[in-house]
């Protein structure tokens, strides 16, 4: 048994039974398939499942709203199936930084297949800066307050933790690549942190006892990776402000608005090819914060994960592709079956590939099981 992997962790009173969590993942599955998949992953021994992209606004084009009866019931079923199978549930609250009205102009091209998903991503990224820079301050206050409202509903739906999504709009406000404002929400690193801090503070004020994690989206230069999120060199400015606002832990990842193959890197990636490919960002966070840090990105090998935990390089580990490849990874590392782990090979063929082709997130191992049957 791996002792450190299976050591409990407490975050603001929430006890996680081990150090492994399921990272927020867009699945693209039907509702029933999605719930079944969550149940399988929870039963596999993960301490907590983070449910990605739960919208804080009343209306959302891409995800169910907590404010609607149908949406609230869906999230209640999500937490129910997770709890039933022995894990905790975390809601990743977010607000999109996409200019939805501007996006409508691209719909005909998408329908006619003249615009590919990758090209659409580029077009939307081009509009992010002007959109973020142009949001009126009066609207910003309503958006940040909605994080508190959504957090209350998430708590009522049964979630045990809130994660504030530090990418999307929080990340774009944080980044000088997109944020060209000259008011109190821009023009300096401290000002660019203000939006995220107000979102966190709204959650903390609404739910004083709820553990709050921040998805810390980090970007870098030389070489350039990530566009939204916090520049590595600006972490000393951002982290104290985020913690003053009420953060309890960090979930550290590469910032968005670059290629999906950067944020979800395959093993062939020219820069992020190794095991634990984003750990160097965790190292930077640890320099300036004593809060628990969760790593994500290419974590598959239990020996490697155990070593990072033992060295206190990280405090817990998030996995997506590995737990899709083998949901029993946590259970196997808790017993004597680690030699039977199906390791993710980071090919991205059926997971990221399935999502991009609107087939849903699956795994090459699924095909092998079908062939055996």
UniProtKB/Swiss-Prot annotation:
Further details from the record: Bilirubin reductase is a key enzyme in the human gut microbiome. The enzyme is essential to human health, as excess serum bilirubin can cause jaundice and even neurological damage. BilR is nearly universally present in the gut microbiome of healthy adults, while the prevalence of the gene is much lower in patients with inflammatory bowel disease (IBD) and in infants, especially during the first few months of life when infants are most susceptible to developing jaundice.
Organism: Clostridium symbiosum (strain WAL-14163)
Name of the molecule in the record: Bilirubin reductase
Family, as annotated: Belongs to the NADH:flavin oxidoreductase/NADH oxidase family.
GO BP annotation list: porphyrin-containing compound catabolic process
Protein's job: Bilirubin reductase that catalyzes reduction of mesobilirubin and/or bilirubin to urobilinogen, a key step during heme degradation. Cooperates with BilS, which is probably involved in electron transfer for BilR. Urobilinogen then spontaneously degrades into urobilin, which gives urine its distinctive yellow color.
Catalysed conversion reaction: urobilinogen + 4 A = (4Z,15Z)-bilirubin IXalpha + 4 AH2; urobilinogen + 2 A = (4Z,15Z)-mesobilirubin IXalpha + 2 AH2
SUPFAM superfamilies named among the record's database cross-references: FMN-linked oxidoreductases (SSF51395)
PANTHER family referenced in this protein's UniProt entry, alphabetically: 2,4-DIENOYL-COA REDUCTASE, 2,4-DIENOYL-COA REDUCTASE [(2E)-ENOYL-COA-PRODUCING]
Entry cofactors: FMN; [4Fe-4S] cluster
InterPro entries referenced in this protein's UniProt entry, alphabetically: Aldolase_TIM, BilR_N, NADH:flavin_oxidoreductase, OxRdtase_FMN_N
UniProt-listed Pfam families: Oxidored_FMN
Enzyme nomenclature, EC number: 1.3.-.-
Active site positions: 168
Residues where [4Fe-4S] cluster binds: 344, 347, 351, 363
NCBIfam families attached to this UniProt entry: bili_reduct_N
Domain of life: Bacteria
